Amino acid sequence: MRLLLRESNITNYWLLLIWSSFLFNPFTIATCIGRPTSVLTTCAILYAISNAVAGASFTSMLALSFAGYLSIYPLLLFPPLIILCYDRRRPTSRPESSIGFVLGNVAAVAGSIYGLLHMSFFITGSWEFLSSTYGVHLLLPDLTPNVGLWWYFFIEMFDSFRNFFLGVFWLHLSSYVGGLTIRLRRQPLFVLTILLGIFAIFKPYPSISDTSLFLGMLPLYQHVFPLMSYTFVESSIVLYATLLGPAFYYLWIYAGSGNANFFYAITLVWSLGWSLLLADILFAVLRDEWEVERPEMRGKEIRQI
């Protein structure tokens, strides 16, 4: 398996833009002000990706295990991350088969999570922490309003259908992993980026911390920005939702002059903006891949037949 490579002008300016776009992003700053534990998950995910790019697969799997230990959803990053580790692995005198490489890293992740869970059991003295941490993500007992799409739907849901739709929502979230990994198997780093954006929209309890992580990864693909078609519309929608979201929340929760539809409507707009951005950047990367494979078609219009 080989990575899809395209010459891109990665200068010191772009390197500066990449790290500054994450560190000085308003969403990142707001996350730090809120002091949530999600920053630990973000750190673990970035460390896992960094080590995967460097070819340190074992360290990458340890970091992914820690991220999955803190919250479940990072474990869905395993397929593209293992492909990235395999593509970037250091050459050895005894080449390792792909199956052996995958099984070894699966064992590393499983062993790490097993050790972390037993460490938590040793500290707390019981397994009750499982339902208080992972059970919250899987069963969605807390329907506190947030920027996600789950809470309002399950407020209106009849209890008899709750378990069914919990399975449907989790199946929907995890269904992107296989398709994107297979279709973009030569660009696993982009698969990781697009999955982080999907998680920021469709996970049970998303926050602006997830959004800041996705935005921090986007500048890695600055060379496909000219191929995007609707950046103004997407930016306007996100800015609109960012400014009105807190106002609608205040009107509903504190002022009492609105209802749940006010805030949920703006969360739909928020999710729409990011969904359009995901679709646009995905099209741009696929167009870039097509132009790399067919240089004679570069700059020509695509028509669907």
Tell where the protein language model's regions lie, with residue ranges.
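Multi-pass membrane glycosyltransferase architecture that uses lipid-linked
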Residues: M1-E128, L166-I305
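Membrane-proximal N-terminal segments immediately preceding the first transmembrane helix
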Residues: N146-F154, F248-W252
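Extracytoplasmic catalytic-loop and juxtamembrane helix elements of membrane-embedded
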Residues: L117-W151
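Active-site rim elements
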Residues: G135-L140, R162-F165, F199-F202
